[in-house]
């Protein structure tokens, strides 16, 4: 699953106990205060335009409204029960019951928004029992289950019931079932019915418009625990089985599933039954089927496999790039892994409303449209890179995840960390000039180091015991930290050994399940190095070290935490928060390495190749290791001087690494902020994408803390306006250059606008006005900048309404997303309030985009408090619409991360106390509370130092 748009659902309401009236009053007062703060800005925020009226949203049938009632069926066939007399009270399924094959048939009734189905499961039983239990949620059993012995004799079923606490349906036989013998299998048959609306998980319907006509598509999304919403199943990843799937669908529709079509049969004049070939053994979360009226774009792999993309007919041309990148990366992975793709075909389909970024269903990958469809005339370079990386990510899964699957969700990183790492290798092969190996620093390594320096982080391998906990581990630690440590590991054991180990692992465990230790064993065999001993320290405890350099060559390690007040020994770790570290360094262009063993408590001394022994050792070149490095102040000063004299002394990745380390160390009170800020003095000569991205990230934190500081904020603005101006002027407001240059231009022009540069803002406003007047077609790589900063600088009600009209008119999802950001950037609280109200209009704002819009509004200084207050006021609505198991709902509370006052912290704590059931949002709540507490302390500790640096700089001219 691609998580970058960062997003299973249970459709039930959670009853919560309200806290004392006083707490409710506190939250209420906080909301009033927050709204009042926003309203004080409304006087001058309407711009110079006259009154306007928002266009009426197009009234399309809603595809994801809450279901009005259950499908027609007998609700009492398998009634809910609290019977806890058996093992079904346990969260995990028993080892003695294992599915071998599913015959699954479904029939979607599109006009009724319901579906019916039948599943017959062949079961191997290794111990006697009278009970069989498997997963089921929301979908209902419509007929008493049937059970047959291996002999074919019928077994009388006494009763069935739902044990909702663990999402099971339990079937009780009249007599004991004896263990299977030989090839004999029990056969359990269940008929069921479910809803197609109200959710973006399980089996659901959504709509799109073609030539003015509203059309429907139905599809599935099952990871991690939502196959049970579509059909009764043993919904755990190590319960692999084969599947024969059939779908009865309207004749004018086509059907897709994991496997190729085996046969199509006419049922009557309205219905066709499509049956698919028997699958290979696979986990339930990979089962997929869809019913559609799409066109296709096809390629053939070097090994002869058909690679097909299904897309709305009007958008067929936008699938060409994805088709090309699919073939290139697919061929590369078949060669790299030395293993052919396992199925006869690979399909992809763009779903108009899709809750995650993409889903790697074996043989039928589903995508959000923004991650598959690219129009070179309308999409930006960043959109193209996004399509390429998501396509590559999902292709990796066809090997890591599908052929070999983690045994349990605690090892999710074996799927997602690997896909996040290899996506860069795949795109690097297909797009050789994109610097994808270096971009891994920007996308994964450095961002997740911030997450992993919190006390509320978690180990890569983490115990999960509920569906909510399973959902919550689809986060930056599993994806980006997983990717980052694989990058370090590949470098340590050498790429050829890493590749060989991956091949051995896939060969040994194909069509099976594996654990992290199995992967370490394969790499140890390939490299003859103590991989498990080293890597356990990176996967079985949270966090990472900072290496302190004493003198020139002596280094010690210590856990790095952003909060200097935190206890570095908590929560307890068997490994004591020490790491076995592959340390690498360069000296006079000579690279050396050593393994820093955690048992060396006093540290180690690096061997110098320079006879004088005084040469500078650049430790962790290109930030290849997942750790930070803190030099002595004198060394940092020398680095600042070297950057000023000739910044190209260091590689672009090293410059990004040094800047990121310095600002992170300063934030953690391990380095004076003056030292970190000195590193930025050279930036007028910086022309590379990597360092600028990390500078912008570091500065964004500082300006978010001082946004309302009327003395200090203008000084920060003035300084960074000056630093970014040379590169901004050099690149200009055009769309020239190669791929990385276009990414750089978008970043630095956006930073210039963010810093209040009048020339940049005027350029954005001028282009915005020309776009409003229809006199110019905006360059694709400037559109987001113009929509955002043109709206921010000169937007009013008329321009806002026009932008909303364009959002409704365009069919390209990537353009819609940019326009949504533009709408969120207006400095007018009345329009922002209207925008927030539109989030409940499912005909206008797709279910997949609601949290995206809230986040965009929170980036607006006028909308920061409004977005947070809207979440609080509409929490019950959001829970009912998305459920607490939705990871996007759980994470939306992180929009409060820039908060930095005791009042804001109090409001957050009161809100969480009022709604204590967090579902998949437990960790995000911990993280945002920790971050806000850190922010409050940060202001106390660092304001004067930072003020002094900027004041002295401006005083000296």
UniProtKB/Swiss-Prot annotation:
Q: Name one Pfam family in it.
A: Peptidase_M1_N
Binding residues for substrate, per the UniProt record?
223, 357-361, 887
Site feature location: Binds calcium which modulates its enzyme activity? 221
* Topological domain ranges for the Cytoplasmic compartment: 1-18
- UniProt topological domain (Extracellular) ranges: 40-957
Q: Name one GO cellular component term.
A: lysosomal membrane
Q: What's its catalytic activity?
A: Release of N-terminal glutamate (and to a lesser extent aspartate) from a peptide
Q: Where does Zn(2+) bind?
A: 393, 397, 416
Q: Which GO terms describe its biological process?
A: angiogenesis; angiotensin maturation; cell migration; cell population proliferation; cell-cell signaling; glomerulus development; peptide catabolic process; proteolysis
Site feature Transition state stabilizer, where = 479
- Region (Disordered) residue ranges read 44-83
The keyword Calcium is assigned to this record: yes
Disulfide bond entries: none
| Co-factor binding details | Binds 1 zinc ion per subunit.
Residues forming the catalytic site: 394
Cell compartment(s), UniProt: Cell membrane
The principal localisation class reads membrane
Q: Name any cofactors this protein relies on.
A: Zn(2+)
User: What tissues is it present in?
Assistant: Expressed in choriocarcinoma cancer cell lines (at protein level). Expressed by epithelial cells of the proximal tubule cells and the glomerulus of the nephron. Also found in a variety of other tissues.
User: Outcome of residue 887 to A?
Assistant: Reduced enzyme activity
The family annotation for this protein states: Belongs to the peptidase M1 family.
Name of the protein in its database record: Glutamyl aminopeptidase
Native species: Homo sapiens
């Amino acid at each position: 699953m691609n998580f970058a748009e960062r997003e299973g659902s249970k459709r039930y309401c959670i009853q919560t106990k309200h806290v004392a009236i006083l707490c409710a009053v506190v939250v209420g007062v906080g909301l009033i205060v927050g709204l009042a703060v926003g309203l004080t800005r409304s006087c001058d925020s309407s711009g110079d335009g006259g009154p306007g009226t928002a266009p009426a949203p197009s009234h399309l049938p809603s595809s994801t409204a809450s279901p009005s009632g259950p499908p027609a069926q007998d609700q009492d066939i398998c009634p809910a029960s609290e019977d806890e007399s058996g093992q079904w009270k346990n969260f995990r399924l028993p080892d003695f019951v294992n599915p071998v094959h599913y015959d699954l048939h479904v029939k979607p009734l599109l006009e009724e928004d319901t579906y019916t189905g039948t599943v017959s499961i062949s079961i191997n039983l290794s111990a006697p029992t009278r009970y069989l239990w498997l997963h089921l949620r929301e979908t209902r059993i419509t007929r008493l289950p049937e059970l047959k012995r291996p002999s074919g004799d019928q077994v009388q079923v006494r009763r069935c019931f739902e044990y909702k606490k663990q999402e099971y349906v339990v079937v009780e036989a009249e007599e004991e079932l004896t263990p299977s013998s030989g090839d004999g299998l029990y056969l359990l048959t269940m008929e069921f019915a479910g809803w197609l609306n109200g959710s973006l998980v399980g089996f659901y319907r959504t709509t799109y418009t073609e030539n003015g006509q509203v059309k429907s598509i139905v599809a599935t999304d099952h990871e991690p625990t939502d196959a049970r919403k579509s059909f009764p199943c043993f919904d755990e990843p190590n319960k692999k089985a084969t599947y024969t799937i059939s779908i009865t669908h309207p004749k004018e529709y086509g059907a897709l599933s994991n496997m190729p079509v085996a046969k199509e049969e006419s049922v009557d004049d309205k219905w066709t039954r499509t049956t698919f070939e028997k699958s290979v053994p696979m986990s339930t979360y990979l089962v997929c089927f869809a019913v559609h009226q799409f066109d296709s774009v096809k390629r053939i792999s070097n090994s002869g496999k058909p690679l097909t993309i299904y897309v709305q007919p009007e958008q067929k041309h936008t699938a060409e790039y994805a088709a090309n990148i699919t073939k290139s990366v697919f061929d590369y992975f078949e060669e790299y892994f030395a293993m052919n793709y396992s199925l006869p075909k690979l399909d992809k389909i763009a779903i108009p409303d899709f809750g995650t970024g993409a889903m790697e269903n074996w043989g039928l990958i589903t995508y959000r449209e923004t991650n598959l469809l690219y129009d070179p005339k309308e999409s930006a370079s960043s959109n193209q890179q996004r399509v390429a990386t998501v396509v590559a990510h999902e292709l990796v899964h066809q090997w890591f995840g599908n052929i070999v699957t983690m045994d349990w969700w605690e090892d999710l990183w074996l799927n997602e960390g690997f896909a996040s790492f290899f996506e860069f290798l795949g795109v690097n092969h297909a797009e050789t000039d994109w610097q994808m190996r270096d971009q891994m620093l920007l996308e994964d390594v450095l961002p997740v180091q911030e997450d992993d320096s919190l006390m509320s982080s978690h180990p890569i391998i983490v115990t999960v015991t509920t569906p909510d906990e399973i959902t919550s581990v689809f986060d930056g630690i599993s994806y980006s930290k997983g990717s980052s440590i694989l990058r370090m590991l590949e470098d340590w054991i050498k790429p050829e050994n890493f590749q060989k180990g991956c091949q051995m692992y896939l060969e040994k465990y194909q069509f099976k399940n594996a654990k992290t230790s199995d992967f370490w064993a394969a790499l140890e065999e390939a490299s003859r190095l103590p991989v498990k001993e080293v890597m356990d320290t990176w996967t079985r405890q949270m966090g990472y070290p900072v290496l302190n350099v004493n003198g020139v060559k002596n280094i010690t390690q210590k856990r790095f935490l952003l909060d200097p007040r935190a206890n570095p020994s908590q929560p307890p770790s068997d490994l004591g928060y020490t790491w076995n570290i592959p340390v690498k360094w360069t000296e006079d262009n000579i690279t050396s390495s050593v393994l820093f063993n955690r048992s060396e408590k006093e540290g180690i001394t690096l061997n110098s190749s320079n006879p004088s022994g005084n040469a500078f050792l650049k430790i962790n070149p290109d930030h290849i290791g997942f750790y930070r490095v803190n030099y002595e102040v004198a060394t940092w000063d020398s680095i600042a001087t070297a950057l000023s004299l000739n910044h190209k002394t260091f590689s672009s990745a090293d410059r990004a690494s040094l800047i990121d380390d310095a600002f992170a160390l300063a934030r953690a009170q391990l380095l004076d902020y003056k030292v970190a800020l000195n590193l930025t003095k050279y930036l007028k000569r910086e022309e590379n994408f990597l360092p600028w991205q990390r500078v912008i990230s570091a500065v964004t934190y500082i300006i978010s803390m001082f946004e309302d500081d009327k003395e200090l904020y203008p000084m920060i603005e003035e300084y960074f306006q000056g630093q970014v101006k040379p590169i901004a002027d050099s690149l200009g407001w055009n769309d020239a250059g190669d791929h990385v240059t276009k990414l750089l231009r978008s970043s630095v022009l956006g930073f210039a606008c963010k810093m209040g540069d009048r020339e940049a803002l005027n350029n954005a406003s001028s282009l915005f006005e020309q776009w409003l007047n229809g006199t110019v077609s905006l360059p694709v790589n400037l559109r987001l900048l113009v929509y955002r900063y043109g709206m921010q600088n000169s937007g009013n009600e008329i321009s806002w309404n026009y932008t909303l009209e364009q959002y409704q008119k365009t069919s390209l999802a990537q353009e819609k997303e940019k326009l949504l950001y533009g709408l969120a950037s207006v400095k007018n609280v009345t329009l922002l309030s209207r925008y927030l109200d539109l989030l409940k209009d499912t005909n206008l704002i797709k279910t997949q985009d609601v949290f995206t819009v809230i986040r965009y509004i929170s980036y607006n200084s006028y909308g920061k408090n409004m977005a947070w207050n809207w979440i609080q006021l509409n929490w019950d609505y959001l829970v009912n619409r998305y459920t607490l198991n939705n990871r996007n709902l759980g994470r939306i509370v992180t929009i409060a991360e820039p908060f930095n006052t005791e009042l804001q912290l109090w409001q957050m704590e009161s809100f969480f106390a009022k709604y204590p059931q967090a579902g998949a949002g437990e960790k995000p709540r911990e993280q945002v509370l920790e971050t806000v507490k850190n922010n409050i302390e940060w202001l106390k500790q660092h304001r004067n130092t930072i003020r002094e640096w900027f004041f002295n700089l401006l005083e000296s001219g």
